[in-house]
Structures are given as structure tokens and as C-alpha cells.
A protein has these predicted regions:
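Claisen-condensing/thiolase-fold acyl-transfer catalytic domains that form or cleave C-C bonds
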Residues: 1-79
Length: 79
């Protein structure tokens, strides 16, 4: 899982609500550590996810972004 956690409090809530193992989320560091450039967060999150899926030989991944105004978007990708 690659979650844009620029607002890290919401990420904690998502992990809890979806019962995700924190060890499987943002394994190379998230947006707070790596950055979340305006207009490029989605690209950064998706490319990081795709590279990690190849590295771990995973077939399915999930990328999500928080957006301004309390909105969000998510994408499931398969390879």
C-alpha cells in the first residue's frame, strides 16, 4: 500500500479502519519523509508503488491521495 500521508493523522485512521498492517504501508517512507510536491503527489505515490510491487513480486497494489477540502482518491493497480 502506498498512502499519501501529508496529513498523517488521517492515515492513522485509515490504517485502523481498514485493519492494515502498518509494516505493509509506505515501506520506503511516505509523503512526510519523501515529500509531496504540489501537482506531482499522485505521480510520486504511483511510481513508488509500482517499483515496490516489482521489487516484492506483488500482483496488486493500492495507491491513495488526500486532497484539499477533505477529498481523497484511490487507485488499485495490477500487473
Amino acid at each position: 500500500y502506498e498512502i499519501n500521508e501529508a496529513f498523517s493523522g488521517s492515515t492513522v485512521a485509515v490504517l485502523k479502519e481498514l485493519e492494515l498492517n502498518p509494516a505493509t504501508v509506505n515501506v520506503n517512507g511516505g509523503s512526510v519523509a519523501l515529500g509531496h510536491p504540489i501537482g506531482a503527489s499522485g505521480c510520486r505515490v504511483l511510481v513508488t508503488l509500482l517499483h515496490e510491487m516489482i521489487k516484492q513480486d506483488k500482483k496488486t497494489g493500492l495507491a491513495s491521495l488526500c486532497l484539499g477540502g477533505g477529498e481523497a482518491v484511490a487507485m488499485v493497480v495490477q500487473r
